[in-house]
A protein has these predicted regions:
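Soluble, non-transmembrane domains of envelope/secretory-pathway proteins that act on or interact
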Residues: 1, 23, 230, 238, ...
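Juxtamembrane regions of bacterial inner-membrane/periplasmic proteins
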Residues: 2-293, 304, 308-310, 315, ...
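Short loop/turn microsegments at loop-to-beta-strand junctions
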Residues: 38-40, 296-299, 503, 518-520, ...
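Residue-level preference for non-acidic, small/hydrophobic
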Residues: 48, 78, 121, 154, ...
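Short pre-catalytic segments that frame enzyme active sites
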Residues: 49-63, 173, 202-206, 258-264, ...
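A generic secondary-structure signal for well-formed alpha-helical elements
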Residues: 82, 86, 105, 125, ...
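Conserved catalytic neighborhood of penicillin-recognizing serine enzymes
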Residues: 106-130, 184, 246-260, 352-408, ...
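A penicillin-recognizing enzyme superfamily signal
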Residues: 270-291, 300-301, 312, 319-328, ...
Length: 682
């Protein structure tokens, strides 16, 4: 029969008191979990790449560690050096304490330490003087931490708080600062240095004391080799690595954007793409160097298929006046960038079609009388011409029929926050067509992405797994017509038209200039991307002569050309299929003339005008060989056997070619002068 062991009553009472006391202290004085888990906010791209980070606690870099993203050889060797029984003790290593006490007794001073990784973590979070009472408190706290956290969580917190010299804490900040990389893949020399540094963080800083850092590193290499963790060859090769040099900068891409998206602590993943972000920032920075000091630019780039923001430049240069302001989020007058949506809504209402005519002449709408940008008028023009050349009066005419408030409501239903810049009332409502209301760069990106998506608008997304609801702004057919018109807009000066460049994406775009030349805009899209550019002064000061076409469109085209494209390269729509029941036939026996110059929809630059000008030689191809030209119904006279047309003024003209069989061909063209180009707003 087993004899029952009986313990003294005083021992039982003591155990109860000690247990109750520990539980009471644990409840009343829990470990500072908030401080233990606090780390620098870090913003990541869509694939987890580091875009930017922010310091905490008087400028400290402390990046949260993740064991899955740290070289496992580092953690194995760290534990071997610092706390070989880490995974078996409960926060306090009693054999290590006994060994340290015996060493101290023999040598008369501390020879080996007894602090576990958990105790070191306690000291990092709650610094205390190096005294015996402090050691006892640290031991108690270590036991607490072991109750609250798993071993891996403790190790991650330790690798988050470990000091590495200066304002650097944690393995992530250390590898970024001293090696310019993450801790996922480390060399033997780097591992040894990272183990040696926390033992004397300031004395062994490689950027300030490379000799001391090398001695500490080599001491760790010797110990690792003696204990069989590395070979003699690995030891020798690691010792050959030189130390020194300046600290690598912490990444700060999309800095202003990241600041707005970052959580209070720890990592925040975004939809940004680090490669596209880097390209956009470089292009914007080079562009900004050519701008006067107070002028800046802002950019939003959106993936049309997902509406995720892939690149975002809140300010091209933070060192300029107002450079710390996110100019993509500030309401500014959008100029003419809303005109495509007026025409699209008019098409939906049956008020207009791409080829229908609208009158362009001085017109008063109540007390509001808009003017064209260059104060010239063209009479009856087709809708596609009015939009392509950004005529003001036709846009306001259609908006008056649609209703200014109704149009504004359609923008708001798409998620766009319309800000009135002037006084309310009917006049302000119609003025929205010409920039009389404030929109942000991000708002304009929502609208143009809707055109790219067949008329469906939805909010932009900045973080993964964000759910949004789409709203139809216009029918797919109307969005397609608008896209076709904007796709045929002339490219910025000095650029080869995209349709002449192999594999160049088909770009639909519109520019805008606010009243007083305060804001220059360019918004464009391809099948894959929507890009919106703003250029101006953050203080809203005017920049005379700086239109959207001159100041913003070149940057838009630079950005789009740097993006990857997988969509259509088609620049002009094919003829629509014949309605059901009809058949396309080709008249092979008798073909009418074909106008070679000027082609349909072309713009012709005239050096001079009138009867004394050089004029333009009109040419056509015809089976009869004989062609007579008419411009606006009047015959064009012959000059040395050629039909030479000498326009009297700039504007739109109808050119007709009639052959010997009486068959004809027509083209509608616009004549421009150098003055027109100087005052152009497209």
């Amino acid at each position: 029969v087993k004899r029952r062991v009986s313990y003294p009553a005083w021992l039982k009472r003591s155990l109860v008191v000690i247990t109750a006391g520990f539980i009471g202290v644990n409840i009343m004085l829990p470990p500072p979990m908030a401080e233990a888990e606090k780390s620098s906010p870090v913003v990541l791209d869509k694939d987890g790449q580091w875009l930017a980070g922010f310091t905490i606690d008087a400028g400290t870099w402390r990046i949260a560690a993740d064991l899955d993203e740290i070289d496992p050889r580092f953690t194995q060797r760290l534990i071997a050096i610092e706390d070989s029984r880490f995974y078996t003790h409960s926060g306090v290593d009693l054999p290590a304490i006994a060994r340290a006490a015996q060493s101290w007794k023999r040598a008369g001073k501390a020879v080996s330490g007894a602090s576990t990784i958990t105790m070191q973590l306690v000291r990092q979070i709650e610094p205390r003087p190096r005294t015996l009472p402090s050691k006892m408190i640290e031991s108690a706290r270590a036991l607490q931490y072991e109750l609250y956290y798993s071993k891996d969580e403790i190790l991650e917190m330790y690798l988050t708080h470990t000091p590495y010299g200066g304002n650097v804490e944690g393995i992530y900040a250390a590898t970024q600062t001293y090696f310019g990389k993450t801790p996922e893949y480390l060399t033997d020399a780097e591992i040894a240095l990272l183990i040696a540094l926390p033992q004397a963080p300031e004395a062994r800083r490689p950027d300030r004391n490379p000799d001391m850092a090398e001695k500490g590193r080599n001491r760790i290499l010797n110990k690792l080799a003696s204990e069989g963790h590395i070979t003699a060859q690995m030891q020798a090769e690691a010792k050959e690595v030189l130390l020194g040099g300046s600290r690598a900068p912490i990444p700060e891409m999309a800095w202003i954007t990241a600041y707005g998206l970052a959580a209070d602590s720890g990592p925040t993943q975004t939809t940004l793409d680090i490669i596209l972000q880097r390209n956009a920032e470089q292009i914007a920075s080079e562009f900004a160097k050519k701008l006067p000091g107070p002028v800046n630019t802002a950019i939003t780039i959106v993936d049309n298929k997902t509406l995720k923001v892939r690149a975002h430049v809140a300010s091209a240069d933070r060192q300029r006046p107002g450079g710390w302001i996110d100019m993509t989020d500030r309401p500014r007058s959008p100029g003419s960038t809303l005109k495509p949506f007026i025409y699209g809504m008019a098409m939906d209402d049956g008020l207009a079609a791409a080829g229908s005519f609208v009158h362009d002449a001085p017109t008063r709408f109540g007390s509001y009388q808009p003017e064209n940008f260059n104060r010239r008028y063209h009479g009856d023009v087709r809708i596609f011409e009015a939009l392509r050349h950004s005529l003001n009066v036709p846009a306001v005419t259609l908006l008056d029929q649609i209703g200014g408030q109704r149009f504004e409501n359609s923008l708001k239903s798409a998620g766009v926050d319309v800000t009135r810049l002037g006084a309310g009332g009917e006049d302000a409502g119609l003025a929205i067509a010409l920039g009389g209301a404030g929109l942000t760069v991000n708002d304009v990106a929502v609208l143009y992405a809707a055109l790219a998506n067949g008329g469906k608008a939805a909010p932009l997304t900045w973080k993964p797994n964000t759910k949004t609801i789409a709203t139809r702004m216009m029918t797919r057919a109307s969005a397609g017509e608008i896209t076709k018109i904007l796709r045929q807009a002339p490219t910025p000066d000095g650029r080869v038209p995209a349709w002449l460049v192999k594999n160049a994406p088909a770009i639909s775009y519109k520019t805008g200039t606010s009243y007083g030349f305060r804001d220059a805009w360019a918004a464009g899209y391809t099948d894959d991307w929507t890009v919106v550019v703003w250029v101006g002064r953050p203080d809203g000061a005017p920049r005379p002569g700086e239109t959207g076409r001159l100041a913003a469109a070149p940057l838009l085209f630079d950005l789009i050309s740097a993006l990857p494209h997988s969509g259509t390269q088609s620049h002009f729509e094919k003829d629509a299929a014949a309605p059901k029941g009809l058949q396309r036939v080709s008249a092979q026996e008798t073909r009418g003339p074909q106008i070679l110059f000027p082609p349909e929809g072309s713009e012709i630059l005239a050096e001079d005008l009138g009867a004394s000008s050089r004029g333009f030689s009109l040419t056509a191809q015809s089976e009869t060989g004989k062609v007579t030209f008419y411009v606006n119904g009047k015959p064009v006279p012959k000059d040395s056997g050629r039909s030479v047309w000498r326009p009297e003024h700039s504007g739109f003209y109808n050119v007709t070619a009639v052959d010997g069989n009486g068959l004809s061909a027509k083209s509608r063209v616009q004549v421009l002068t150098f003055d027109d180009l100087a005052n152009a707003e497209l």
